[in-house]
């Protein structure tokens, strides 16, 4: 790979088509599916037909399984790059859980949110009378109290989800800017210590707090929960949460600026020159889409050239690998394989 080129691959299995025209800003940004774009030009097209079109670019759909896996990778990278801006002793992996006296839930007949709620089923009924639920305001209040107590600038990435076996709500968080003073070890796994803090438990006020030093593994763990839940809330899962009145699994994070922004501002030329992010574990990560959006604001022509080179190489490489199959067919085959793999593993 030459300097100035990106090694990012098209991870989307259902790419959309975007028109870019610097001299006609009113049509820049228009997006089409391959079928709709074929209708627009009046003939059936293949992705290969667009390879060398200077004003046409393939962009991720943001919804397919390939895009969701890439979103997990992007978040993992951004969480790590944010951590590089903080001392190690101020970056922690935290799990917030509820005790029986504080676990939130809903009475389905009234929609009332209450504490001390358990899942209650009546014989012969398809839905319970009451369910436990995530409560985003609990996270907001926790962070507000934490900032007030320590009078420090805090940043975070938080995923709210339900336990696999008990469906009990809890939260996983990467917390930046908090430096504990009263850690008490709970146990160790493979040399990694897990702690609690009386101060943090009081600030949380709803149950237990488990704390561990943040690592690349925990960054990926939290980001993985986000994408996993995004995938699970499609279809039947989405209907189940809706019917039960539960808050769907969610992610929330520090904004303005977004996570990893400071690293980008300090290293943007290096990032675009080398075309990848060098991670702590020795691996090279693709440049997050968040960074591409910032580049698009700063220098859209440069980003367009980078994406054009990436697109040509991706399609040409697939053409050589799978001679006789068009790019769309290859993507459909790859999507089926990826779905089977993720279903088998039970994760994204």
Regions from the PLM with identified roles:
Residues 65, 95, 157-159, 210-212, ...:
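Residues in well-ordered beta-strands of folded domains
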Residues 70-165:
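Signature for HUH/AEP ssDNA processing cores
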Residues 62, 136-140, 220:
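A structural signal for well-ordered alpha-helical segments within the folded catalytic domains
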Residues 129, 152-153, 163-169, 173-309:
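Conserved His + Asp/Glu catalytic blocks
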Residues 207-210, 305-348:
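C-terminal non-catalytic accessory extensions
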Residues 62, 92, 169:
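Residue-level detector of short, conserved catalytic/binding motifs and their immediate flanks
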Residues 5, 24, 29, 41-43, ...:
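Intrinsic-disorder/low-complexity loop/linker signature
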Residues 1-80:
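DNA replication initiation on ssDNA origins
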């Amino acid at each position: 790979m030459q300097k100035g080129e990106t090694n990012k691959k098209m991870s989307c299995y259902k790419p959309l088509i975007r028109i870019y025209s610097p001299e006609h800003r009113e049509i820049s940004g228009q997006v089409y599916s391959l079928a709709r774009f074929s209708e627009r030009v009046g003939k059936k097209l293949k992705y290969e037909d667009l390879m060398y079109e200077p004003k046409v670019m393939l962009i991720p759909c943001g919804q397919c399984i390939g895009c969701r896996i890439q979103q997990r990778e992007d978040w993992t990278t951004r969480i790590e790059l944010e951590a590089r801006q903080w001392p190690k002793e101020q970056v922690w992996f935290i799990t917030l859980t509820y005790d029986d006296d504080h676990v939130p839930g809903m009475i389905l007949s009234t929609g009332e949110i209450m504490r001390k709620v358990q899942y209650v089923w009546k014989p012969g009924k398809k839905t319970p009378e009451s369910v436990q639920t995530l409560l985003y305001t609990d996270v907001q209040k926790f962070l507000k109290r934490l900032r007030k107590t320590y009078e420090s600038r805090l940043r975070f990435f938080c995923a709210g989800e339900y336990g696999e076996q008990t469906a009990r709500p809890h939260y996983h968080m990467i917390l930046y800017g908090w430096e504990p003073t009263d850690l008490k070890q709970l146990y160790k796994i493979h040399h990694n210590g897990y702690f609690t803090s009386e101060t943090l438990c009081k600030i949380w006020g709803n149950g237990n707090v488990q704390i561990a030093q943040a690592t690349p593994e925990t960054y990926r763990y939290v980001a993985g929960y986000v994408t996993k839940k995004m995938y699970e809330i499609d279809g039947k899962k989405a209907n189940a949460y809706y019917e039960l009145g539960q808050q769907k699994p969610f992610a929330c994070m520090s904004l303005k600026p977004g996570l990893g922004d400071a690293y980008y501002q300090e290293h943007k030329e290096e990032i675009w020159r080398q075309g990848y992010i060098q991670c702590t574990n020795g691996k090279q990560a693709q440049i997050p889409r968040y960074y591409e959006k910032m580049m698009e604001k700063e220098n859209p022509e440069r980003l367009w050239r980078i994406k054009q080179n990436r697109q040509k190489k991706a399609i040409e490489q697939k053409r050589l690998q799978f001679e006789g199959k068009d790019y769309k067919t290859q993507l459909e085959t790859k999507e089926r394989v990826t779905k089977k793999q993720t279903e088998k593993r039970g994760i994204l």
